[in-house]
UniProtKB/Swiss-Prot annotation:
One Gene Ontology cellular component: cytosolic large ribosomal subunit
Function summary: This protein binds specifically to 23S rRNA; its binding is stimulated by other ribosomal proteins, e.g. L4, L17, and L20. It is important during the early stages of 50S assembly. It makes multiple contacts with different domains of the 23S rRNA in the assembled 50S subunit and ribosome.
Subunit structure comment from the entry: Part of the 50S ribosomal subunit.
Gene this protein is translated from: rplV
Xref: Pfam families: Ribosomal_L22
CDD domains named among the record's database cross-references: Ribosomal_L22 (cd00336)
Protein's name in the database: Large ribosomal subunit protein uL22
Keywords associated with the record: Ribonucleoprotein, Ribosomal protein, RNA-binding, rRNA-binding
Disulfide bonds: none
GO molecular-function terms, A-Z: rRNA binding; structural constituent of ribosome
GO BP terms: translation
Family: Belongs to the universal ribosomal protein uL22 family.
Length: 113
C-alpha cells in the first residue's frame, strides 16, 4: 500500500532539489531522514519535511507500520516562477526568475491491498 505527501511552492529551484532526491530514492524512510539530517542543503530540510508528512499519512490514514516504509517514488516538478526586475546599465533591465518547486513523495510498505 502507498501513501503520498506533496509540498508545493517551495522557494528552491528544481535543479537544486533533484540531486538531493537522488540520495534518498529507494531507501527506507528512517535511513533517508538520517541522510538528509546531515546534508548542508536547504533542499534537504524541505525533502525531510515532506518524507515525514508521507510517513505520518501512512501511519494515520492507512495503518502502516512506520518502520517498514520505503521511499518508493520521489520527484520534483517545477512550480510557477516569481518574476523580478534587475536594473542594468544604460536604462536597461533584465528579468530574474525566482523558481519554485513542487515536491512529491510516495512511500510504500511492500504489501498489496
Amino acid at each position: 500500500m502507498q501513501a503520498k505527501a506533496v509540498t508545493k511552492y517551495v522557494r528552491i529551484s528544481p535543479t537544486k532539489v533533484r540531486p538531493v532526491m537522488d540520495l534518498v530514492r529507494g531507501k527506507p524512510v528512517d535511513r533517508a531522514l538520517a541522510i538528509l539530517r546531515y546534508l548542508p542543503h536547504k533542499a534537504a530540510r524541505e525533502i525531510a519535511r515532506t518524507i515525514e508528512s508521507a510517513r505520518a499519512n501512512a501511519t494515520n490514514n492507512y495503518d502502516m507500520a512506520p518502520d517498514a516504509l520505503v521511499v518508493k517514488y520521489i520527484f520534483a516538478d517545477e512550480g510557477p516562477a516569481f518574476k523580478r526586475i534587475m536594473p542594468r546599465a544604460r536604462g536597461r533591465a533584465d528579468r530574474i526568475r525566482k523558481r519554485t518547486t513542487h515536491i512529491t513523495v510516495i512511500v510504500d510498505d511492500g504489501e498489496e491491498m
